[in-house]
């Protein structure tokens, strides 16, 4: 593949309001995972992954526990997934994943950032085919052959293993996430995953260098992040200041 996985940490966690947004996002995802499966992370792998991810992002334990208890009690909202695709500032490709209890409200909220930044929301599938749905695991290391051997011994369907600047990035189909992570944990005792994601990785990137377009892009992403129903935003833009 010839490309290292870049972890883009959002600046949204820098304010109290943004932290509340992060907590709300995880609370909703954990609630849905627990409600759609077993409310026990030892049985429900999706729930376990979300809990581990939430803890890494410093989501308070009471937020996690409340979401699971709410799902176990059978009460609460009925959420459905919604995905919107299109072209953002600089003609970058964008995927917006949502959880919603009101699809009409959600499409209205998501469409607004596109409209306000002269971007274009498209039809389902218009850009998703230009992204790979990957499990991505990143950790310190410099020997890709040893990592690849450990994964192949566990019969993991590996797409790629990259090494760059003392960091190993493992790419596998998203369906291989738990298998790949378990294989690495068993092969390398005490492994610490700096990247632990199921995500959409763009097949090609687009560089944005114009200051006005960069400002418009920042506005676009901020407006999407402010939408209550938006859970994840994926794009292929690389900002060059």
From Swiss-Prot:
InterPro entries: Integrase-like_N, TACO1_YebC-like_2nd/3rd_dom, TACO1_YebC_N, Transcrip_reg_TACO1-like, Transcrip_reg_TACO1-like_dom3, YebC-like. GO terms for biological process: regulation of DNA-templated transcription. One of its GO terms (cellular component) is cytosol. GO terms for molecular function: DNA binding. It is found in: Cytoplasm. Pfam families: TACO1_YebC_N (PF20772), Transcrip_reg (PF01709). It comes from the Bacteria. The keyword Cytoplasm applies. PANTHER family: TRANSLATIONAL ACTIVATOR OF CYTOCHROME C OXIDASE 1 (PTHR12532:SF0). Belongs to the TACO1 family. This is Probable transcriptional regulatory protein PSHAb0060. It comes from Pseudoalteromonas translucida (strain TAC 125).
